[in-house]
Amino acid sequence: MKIQEGFAAEGRLPKVELHHTELAIIGGGLSGVCTAITAARKGVKVVLVQDRPVLGGNSSSEVRLWILGATSHLGNNNRWSREGGVVDEILVENTYRNKEGNSLIFDAVLLDKVIAEPNITLLLNTAVYEVDKKEDDTIASVKGFCSQNSTEYIIHAPLFCDASGDGIVGFLSGAAFRMGAEKKEEFGEKFAPTEEYGELLGHSMYFYTKDTGRPVKYTAPAFAMDVSKGVPKFKKFNAKEHGCQLWWLEHGGRMDTVHDTEQIKWDLWKVIYGAWDYIKNSGNFPEAETMTLEWVGTIPGKRESRRFEGDYMLRQQDIVEQREHDDAVAYGGWSIDLHPADGVFSEKPGCNQWHAKGVYQIPYRCLYSKNIKNLFLGGRLISATHVAFASTRVMATAAHIGQAIGMAAYIAKEKQYLYPRDILTKGFVPDLQHELLKTGQHIPKLVLQDEKDLVQQAALTASSSFELAAFDADFALPIDTAVAQMLPLEAGSVPDITVEVDVKEDTSLQVELRTSSRAGNYTPDVTLEIQSIPLAKGRRKVKLSFSATMPERAYAFLTFHKNSALSLFRTRTRVTGILTAFNLINKAVSNFGKQTPPEDIGMEAFEFWCPQRRPDGHNLALQIEPALTPFGVEQIKTGVYRPTTAPNAWVAAMEDFAPQLKISWEEPQKIRQIDLFFDTDYDHPMESVLMGHPEDVMAFCVRNYKIVDDEGRVVFEKEGNYQSMNRIELEEPVTTSALTIIVDHPSANVPASLFSVRCYN
């Protein structure tokens, strides 16, 4: 091809491409991605505009921050709190493909998920720079430019979602926004920071290192800083930590975190290259002689800039008090996590985290602009105070919010293109909640009640159901850390529990029976009974009988005080909804075993009881009389797809070598779709990069199953499952009076389980 053009006195214009769509999403971070996929799967035509070459934002290979949310590195009391829906699907997929946490592979996981959706048009490397409005309060279109193909895109849509991080669409459209911290008097937030501490969170950039196996020299660039003089905490640098383990490499909280970003980047580069000079050339790290820099970030990962105003602003009290909202569509659970504005140049600790006792609801009213009729607010732009934002800002929470927005766009379309606020004012929030729950999106305190689900009218039987009568004693471990066996109990009397101990010397076994003061929480802040049992040296069984009663259906914590003279026997058996928790320390999330805040900051004091990551974290060997039986087949009708106040799962007996669940109807039913929900361990955080995981498939997940009709014909069969939700859309509907689901146990130590089965015509 040959092109030759003469002089054009009037100049030239770039190529222009028009798009007319139903939802335009600006921002391809995790929130934008989950918004797009959720909407697209419901039939909404989506244009997803991302100004970077890859998707994922701060989770991408350009920044390399791990994805976290309510699970908080398994360092808080939020059990089974990993976010559901599309973000769960992504994290489970990434763990399966990429358990080592390679950020480049995670890029590919996100790209795969997006391009698999025919209703999504993806525009990468495209920066939106202009908004056109048809009225003062209504956006008509946005313009973006892609420097890679020199093309201008004009995107028209009835609905827009700004998930851009800095809020370019909201800003250009004139929507009300805030930057900086509110005074404590405005919302009654006692944790509102002082100007001296700082009113903005800064940016971070990271670096990766590798050992080459041979000496490598390093000459720092001229712009590198002498960190021993410029960084007060320079001695924290070491040859072992890299990537987002250096989250405290933060700067910009005293600057304009939108318009000063390029200068902030240069300032962070000075620190990074200076830090590596210190590690390589100070002589303090001889192990660094053979190490080299493998990667340095080229764009900052942003924490905070603009926050936009919706019909409600989430605040500190919503999080700490776990306030309930009729329009709840998502939840959070990260700590309220403020950082000193001076960041890496501050002598203060890099963060100031305070946890709530459990997860909190996020209302729909926070997810759209109060000024611009057709603008959703996604990601870190949602309507929240600076203090509340310190919790909602993390990526898994932002993604969960994005899924609510994507589903809201579907509801708006189905109801003849409502505006976002109309979903609230015209009474469609229950429809929104219903559709979200169907996807596996957990909303605390809500359960799915689906009249179209044929299973709800069916009779259920199973070849067996697990009963927790005893766990075998496989090995013993000393009680070096206080440990609690979490057990799902009904209201009323507490069963007798027998444990097995090995006593090194005469001592006493200190036992407490605890539960939570709030239904659905897992903070054992209520002590029901205390026992002290004298024990002589030797191995023996100890029977615990309690006079206390459980006030309601909930998890009880059978807690054993730290005592190195005692070893408790453990089992290798793991069961859905049954686990141990430990009074552990996790400094990464400011968990020091107990949270003891100052009296005047509006936070609560409590102990942390957290599981250990596999392969650790074994259940205690115990005997229970009468046996616990919350694992029956009726659990698949509960409308909840994770443990809450009970396991909420059918669990087969371990000795059942061919577990089967049968669904029967009085009359034959025509079935086109079957939804199955398996246990992928919602307690496991599934950090997306760097950290790595011991498994690529979660220990509780059923790998192999088949579904047969009333004549024994196989309707569907799957081997090698690893996902939470399996949606089976049959090419031809099956007419049958029964379906039988036959499952294999995940392993010899884990019985098969199933949270839910749904069937639709």
Question: What is the predicted role of each segment?
Answer:
Residues 486, 498-501, 506-520, 576, ...:
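Aromatic, loop-rich ligand-recognition surfaces of beta-strand-rich domains
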Residues 32:
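N-terminal Rossmann-fold NAD(P) dinucleotide-binding loop
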Residues 2-4, 10-20, 38, 44-45, ...:
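Conserved N-terminal/central alpha/beta ligand/cofactor-binding core
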Residues 17-29:
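Beta1/beta-strand and adjacent pyrophosphate-binding region of the FAD-binding site
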Residues 3-5, 10-13, 58, 140-141, ...:
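Flavin (FAD/FMN)-binding glycine-rich loop and adjacent Rossmann-like elements that form
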Residues 53, 562-564, 745-747:
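Surface-exposed loop/turn motifs at beta-strand-loop junctions within extracellular Ig-like
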Residues 554-562, 739-743:
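Short, aromatic- and glycine-rich surface loops/edge beta-strands on solvent-exposed regions
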Residues 577-654:
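PGST-rich, cysteine-poor low-complexity/disordered linker and tail segments that act as flexible spacers
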